[in-house]
Amino acid sequence: MKKIYEWEPWFFMFFGLFHLHRIWGLIDRTSYADFWIGILESKGIFYFVLMGILAFLCVCGIATFCKNIKNNYWWRWIYIFGGSYVLFDLFAIAIELKVWNDLLLFMFDVNSQYWNIVWGFFIILGAFVFCLGMKLLKQRKEQI
């Protein structure tokens, strides 16, 4: 039988909110870019706590997908594709992979004509993932 684990709706709502914070980037490009570039360059406690939480959640999601390989919901594929992407992203940032650093600098270029497209996409993704989490929370309550 398919089961939604207690933490799964919160997983999606957390990632959704994390993406939705990018609305700040549409409101104030400079402070948003300065904040995140500062976090990425300083690699202070906030950086390591955030990266640790993101990595832990991705590993949990991928493990859950694998554990339920024969009886998965469609949305658990997000764990594989999204989790793999985030883990690669965290790894590339940690080892300061040049091509990835160049991509991040492009993404945080406040003068880029693509700024609203890039961050708008992440905001839409965040809204979708947050709504998915809310839907899963409702379905989980119906399962109990």
What are these regions (language model features)?
Residues K2-F18, G44-F48, Y79-L90:
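Alpha-helical transmembrane segments of integral membrane proteins, especially early/N-terminal helices
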Residues S31-F46, L90-V118:
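Interfacial non-cytosolic loop connecting adjacent transmembrane helices
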Residues T64-F88:
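Loop-to-transmembrane helix junctions at the membrane interface
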Residues R140-I144:
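Short, highly charged, low-complexity non-transmembrane loops/tails of multi-pass membrane proteins
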